[in-house]
């Protein structure tokens, strides 16, 4: 195993810290969506024990992000020493990300959320004094950070995009597309981002031999696909999705749910969901899953 392969096999730990109100919670949420195992507000003294667990090779702990802030002020003072100890003694890749913002911006954010700064709770002081005290206390950990991000002029979306550029693992694609078929008469797919109604297509229900089957059966699938209307629809649908899906991912979504509905969710929607799932698997390097919610609900009513 060469040096590059050894580095790739190591577990990775990202310590996220910085000024209160600078965006740590948003960063942790983003990292979690990217496949990181996330821990919020771990006391620094427990960091070496936690890293020892990572060294044991648990797959779920291959990429870990830990948020540490100044709420435990006395414990926080040991963070720099603990990080140095971990780097020198334990075979884990460790980075420190420090988030900060201007005092004016932090004051504005606290006014918007109406939350108290953690250092205001430890004594009767103004918000601006609490922010200045925190900035001073965190200066040492800031000095050893691998990444310092000033979020003053970053929107939540822009901050997420920056985090993804820094830390997204190209070998671990977390964006997932779920394609599901459903029947309108059983209720719409509530978690869908996109819903397409295919009740305008010729219905296999009216072919006696096809009625008890589903779109998973070859005869039903071929029946649905043989119509010119189906081909035109599928071409327009895939053209639309080819345009939209990269935009959804760029926007920061970790999952896209595409629902295709017919009357009962047994024939047309099932066949088209299968075809769409196969198409998306071929075109995109994302995780694509196909699910048929109502395909096997037995009913004597029109499907």
UniProtKB/Swiss-Prot annotation:
Coiled coil: none
UniProt keyword list: ATP-binding, GTP-binding, Nucleotide-binding
Sites where the protein binds GTP: 69-72
Recorded superkingdom: Bacteria
Residues annotated as binding ATP: 18-25
HAMAP family for this protein: RapZ_like
Physiological role: Displays ATPase and GTPase activities.
Protein name per UniProt: Nucleotide-binding protein SAB0719
Organism of derivation: Staphylococcus aureus (strain bovine RF122 / ET3-1)
